[in-house]
A protein has these predicted regions:
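Bacterial N-terminal signal peptides that target proteins for export
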Residues: 1-17
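Bacterial N-terminal signal peptides
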Residues: 13-27
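Acidic-glycine-rich active-site phosphate/pyrophosphate-binding loop
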Residues: 111-126, 221-231, 391-397
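Acidic/His- and Gly-rich active-site-bordering loop/insert found
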Residues: 32-136, 145-162
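Histidine/acidic-residue-rich, glycine-tolerant segments that coordinate divalent metal ions
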Residues: 125-135, 142, 154, 159-279, ...
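Metal-dependent amide/peptide-bond hydrolase catalytic core
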Residues: 32-35, 81, 250-442
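Divalent metal-coordination and catalytic microenvironments
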Residues: 58, 97, 110, 140, ...
Length: 442
């Protein structure tokens, strides 16, 4: 588990990691031995048709967050055939499976998300969604099938494994239904990383770059995602006599403009942050001064420092404007997912695996973005390693983005993702096999 405030540490440029890696290639690296590597390749070739069929079945039968009943049943039934120690119903519908290696060592974990999105699929695929208005438009069907394939391969290598692997199939990454807990936070709360304690956790996510490429960086890679609601409480009056009221619409407009100064004037421009207003609701008729206006929006940041700094600045602006004009207000701020933080030491240790498998020209530098991902809760509990897997057909000039009704990942990414995860997990265990659980240097 990382210690200290990560906002005080600067993201390590990937170029420096790769430069250090290339400088070290002349010396022996702990890596999967050739015999095991060939075994992985052979098993992937043998099972890839089955894994793709699993992916297509999941794609045809998408389920929303905390409702992944059939997906979890399929995952559990497949894991049962592998002889793993399985916990069902973790965080509602999650599945956690433990593979105990034949040799002593620490425990590493790997996670895939299982939920779909409320989107009507428009791909026209022969295996398109059978559930109206629900689609796997973010690649979670791909992630789940890759992780099942990884469990299949590593189970066949049990005698070679130094330590343990925890496979985490997570519900509700896109968010739990209103009023329900869910996702990674609930999995952590219910002990998905315990018994035995996990020393490092890995995950991948589909991204519309070419198959054969991955995107990666140490440090912050995605932003936190918070929401806010501001209610301006004015006083109604006739539209022809505005001086007798307090116009909540005018004050709301002033607040929208003033909030933009939080990012442009109060935040370090080298530390990304966004304050966006998504909805404004107020007023009832054209000739009535609005008494109440509600604004809703999102705040996205990378660093913990900005996440702590911005909310009180926002409220001070709202309070000042409202008090100046004799209005009241209510400011509600709802923290969401934290930023995903790739542990720098773990990143430096494991980056060579990506380069050795793919070649340094295929390991692209990920530029941190203010999208959000609840893998961050796992990475707060134990060092995390998160990367993006290219799923675009290289023959096509462009591909539909995530969350598009046309999103259609190239299935050739599935065996490659399986191979990458197998090597990452085995390399991590090999490099930590002499370190007792709970005393990992990561």
């Amino acid at each position: 588990m990382r210690t200290g405030d990560p906002s005080a540490r600067r993201t390590i440029p990937l170029a420096l990691v790769l430069a250090a890696l290339l400088a070290s290639l002349s010396s022996p690296l702990l890596a999967v031995d050739p015999k095991t590597a060939q075994k992985i390749d052979d098993e992937i070739e043998r099972t890839k048709s089955e894994v793709v069929k699993i992916r297509r079945f999941i794609h045809m039968n998408p389920e929303l967050g905390n409702r992944e009943f059939e997906t979890a049943r399929l995952v559990g039934s497949k894991l049962d055939t592998l002889g793993l120690e399985i916990r069902r119903g973790v965080a509602k519908t999650g599945v956690v499976a433990l593979l105990r290696g034949a040799q002593p060592g620490i425990t590493v974990a790997v996670r895939a998300d299982m939920d779909a999105l409320p989107i009507q699929e428009m791909t026209g695929l022969p295996f398109k969604s059978l559930n109206a208005g629900v689609m796997h438009a973010c690649g979670h069907d791909v992630h789940t099938s890759i992780l099942l394939g990884t469990a299949m391969i590593l189970s066949s290598l049990k005698e070679r494994i130094k330590g343990n692997v925890t496979f985490i199939f997570q519900p509700a990454e896109e968010g739990a239904p209103a009023g329900e807990e869910g996702g990674a936070a609930l999995m952590v709360k219910e002990g998905a990383l315990d018994n035995p304690p996990v020393s490092a956790i890995f995950a991948l996510h589909s991204w519309p770059e070419n198959v054969g490429e991955v995107l990666f960086a140490p440090g912050y890679i995605t932003g936190s995602s918070d929401e806010f609601q501001i209610t301006v409480k004015g006083r109604s009056a006739h539209g022809a006599r505005p001086h007798e009221g307090v116009d909540a619409i005018v004050l709301a407009a002033e607040i929208v403009q003033a909030l933009q100064t939080v990012v442009s004037r109060a935040v370090d421009p080298t530390d990304p942050a966004v304050v966006s207003i998504g909805t404004i609701q107020g007023g009832s008729r054209s000739n009535i001064i609005a008494e109440r206006v509600t604004l809703e929006g999102t705040v996205r940041v990378l660093s913990d420092a900005n996440r702590k700094k911005i909310p009180p600045l926002m409220e001070s602006i709202v309070k000042g404007i409202c008090e100046m004009h004799g209005a009241g207000y209510q400011f509600d701020y709802r923290p969401g997912y934290p930023s995903v933080y790739n542990n720098p030491e773990l990143a430096t240790t494991m980056a060579p695996t990506l380069v050795q498998l793919l070649g340094k020209d295929k390991v692209l530098e990920w530029k941190p973005q203010l999208i959000a991902e609840d893998f961050s809760y796992f990475a707060q509990k134990t060092p995390g390693f998160y990367f993006f897997l290219g799923v675009k057909n290289p023959a096509l000039p462009t591909a539909a983005p995530l969350h598009s009704p046309y999103f259609n990942p190239d299935e050739r990414a599935i065996p490659l993702g399986t191979k990458i995860l197998c090597h990452l997990l085995l390399d991590a265990l090999d490099q930590q096999s002499t370190v007792s659980a709970g005393a990992s240097r990561f």
